[in-house]
Amino acid sequence: MSIQNEMPGYNDVDQLLNQQGVGLTPAEMHGLISGLLCGGNTDSSWLPMVHDLTNEGLAFGHELAQALRNMHSAISDSLDDDGFLFQLYLPEGDAVSVFDRADALAGWVNHFLLGLGVSQPKLDKVKDETGEAIDDLRNIAQLGYDEDEDQEELEMSLEEIIEYVRVAALLCHDTFSRQQPTAPEVRKPTLH
């Protein structure tokens, strides 16, 4: 299955967010929407939740709303494709430093956890592998670096962390989005 809904361009979303006065980066918005989806929110309530969390409950203008609908659809499609196509939405290019990418990753993770927490209010009760991954994400959200660090080494470490975050998000999606099996009927033995 290929992604039918294409992700809007990072710089385009950045411009639309700035025009609307929304204090989030495209990476943070993608993290928030991804968190809502990975937390099991599959209905149309996601956009009003995003309004509440990012814009004091006010609806976005048409262009930004459409870009976010496209983003939501693209994320949903990539998650539904067994997650193979799901990627974090971070700034790229020669003009983007490794430090900018590290900051964007921390913002993505923070907002992913926000979206996940809104969808799954008892997030702190999650155990096993998913609970450990969520704890790791909380630590990654506080990601720090020393600007004197070797940038090539930091870039390699960052790529490993990005892949770990991607897999952790997929694990959350698998945990919270799968259908809970219904309990089989318990039959009481008939007394004769």
Swiss-Prot record:
Pfam families, A to Z: UPF0149
Cross-referenced Gene3D superfamilies: YgfB uncharacterised protein family UPF0149, PF03695
Cellular component annotations (GO), alphabetically ordered: cytosol
Domain of life: Bacteria
Family membership: Belongs to the UPF0149 family.
NCBIfam families membership: PRK01736.1 (NF002477), ygfB_yecA (TIGR02292)
Name of the protein in question: UPF0149 protein KPK_0755
